[in-house]
Amino acid sequence: MGENRLLFRSPAICLTVTAALLSLQIPGILALPLEEETSAAAPLTRSLQASPPSNNLDSVTALFAQVAVGGGYTTIFALLNTGDTDLNGRLVLTDAEGNPMKVALSSPPADPGDIPPGAPADSMNILIPRGGTRFIAAEPPGALSDTRTGWARVESTGGRLGGAATFQFVEAGELKTIAGVLAADAVEVATIPVNNDDIQNRYTGYAIANPSATDVNIKIVVLDESGSTVETLILPSLNPLGPGKQIARFLHQDSQRLKFKGSMVLLADTGKRVSVVALVLEQGLLTAIPVIPAKAPHVN
């Protein structure tokens, strides 16, 4: 029987979300290939150079804090230009350790399983005309590849970029589950609603990526429904979170709050910014929830 799952990965462990339970496993790390493709209307080219994060985030116009590829997973990026000029840019993928995430990048056909692999690369140059849309799939070379996780960014000029990343899990050619998250800006603070209930198999998770070229320290303040602080988490894995690195966890892994209503506030160092996404697993179904880029004044 197949699993409906999404992988939340830290440097040491990978949390596999299944329909019935949460199980821990350590995935293999593979270098994944990439397909060569061009388009007359909007050429797509690949960069085979490493793409390190930058201290200047002004050129970063979209951030996706969670990307899953392999083990049945494909991540599809939908990028839209709602501006009045053409958009020139580059999609860059980075793994959880801050290294270039080599995958197969292509514009997907109707059946994601039919996309052939190509030469390995961690980035793709993009040109989107005004009002245009581009779909780009990130996938492994074959169905037997282990799952890898990381994050992605788009650096661009011109136009106005919007987008979403959709994770889809395919087993034996059949789509089993799908979930999407919107592109977001880097933030200094993020508040996430929490409504955990282990009886209902409902858990709140988060993924954080450091898009800068310097360390960032992040603490998590847990508030109850009345807004009172009940716990402050200073996790070694987040203090610091190194340049280009990413981590994904469920709150109850670190606070043991299996049945809890309230919120968690992620606070980065003053002047530092991170990319954050939040997801809720309930009864084996995954959905994205809002990340609010603000906090109550008393939360520090």
Give each language-model segment a name.
Residues 1-9:
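N-terminal secretory signal peptides that target proteins for export/translocation
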Residues 11-14, 70:
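Short hydrophobic/aromatic segments of transmembrane alpha-helices and their interfaces
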Residues 25-300:
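Gly/Pro-rich, tryptophan- and cysteine-flecked surface segments typical
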Residues 14-28:
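Bacterial N-terminal signal peptides
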